[in-house]
Amino acid sequence: VKNDMRSLKLHCIGVVQNITRSGMSKSQKLQACWSYVINNTYYSSAYYPNLNQNDWWRMTAWRTLATGKGNCYGYACAFAALAREIGYDPYVVCGRVPGTRDGAGDGFTRHSWVIINGLHYDPEGQAKGWHTGVYGSYSYGMDNQIQKTVNFRTGRGN
């Protein structure tokens, strides 16, 4: 997949035009973006982004939207890219949640989700069914450790 940020922008414009109507509210458009990512992305653990690479969040969004495959980072970045396209200012969260996938002794595993205006969104948790209902939630709803957040537009974060 060619990691071209112009291609990401054009792809997001096309998706948003296909899944929204002019009479929809901004929140209705966000729900349409959420549904699109959940219903058009298949889980694949074949690719993990290098979180130290410049623009990893944009490259991950492009890879996921272009191939229809991704892990939690892919779901989060794809949703953030579409949310950005409709005028939101999303943050991609890189954190840890209870789990055993990483084999860490503390019982936590890597995970990624999105925060918009202080509210949490977990498209991969919803799609896979292990952490449903985290859509515009005031809290994440389970123990978590936030390691860093990245503003999708600027790349700034902690």
Region annotations inferred by a language model:
Residues 74-143:
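Hydrophobic/aromatic-rich core segments of domains that either
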Residues 1, 15-16, 37, 92-93, ...:
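Extended aliphatic helical segments
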Residues 2-64:
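Secondary-structure boundary elements
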Residues 29-37, 68-83:
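Active-site nucleophilic cysteine motif
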